[in-house]
Amino acid sequence: GELRRHFNNDPGLILHNPIDESTHGFTDGIYGPLKIMQKAEVDFLMVHIPMGMFLLPQAISEVTSLKVLVKDVVRMHREGSMPMAVVISHTILPDTRVAVIERQETLAAAGLPVFNSVSGAARAIDRFIKWHEGRAEV
């Protein structure tokens, strides 16, 4: 529905699960898609920001893009009700590394769980869901 219409159909994009927003958001942010996902049939949202892997136009810095994305994630977390986790894959570039640490602190201060890898986030989400399922059975 509405979520699928937002995403283009470029070759290589995964349009089911997970949703690939890699060709958007670097200057405009990702608030719009996050807001749509809050209404869609999505149970849990993991936002992955792969530092050092962005294919950005030359005029856009990776640090600027990171700030825009984190701002939108924090805004959606405050306004929405869906459980969210954020993964910021690390980079070895000194300037970017400092920005990553600062944004991780911003996300944690907003109450969002922050992970360094998708696998670490997936394990934590799995445990979170199993814990809640166990509580529901009691």
PLM feature spans:
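Short glycine-cluster motifs
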Residues: 1-61
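Peripheral docking tails and interdomain loops at the edges
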Residues: 61-138
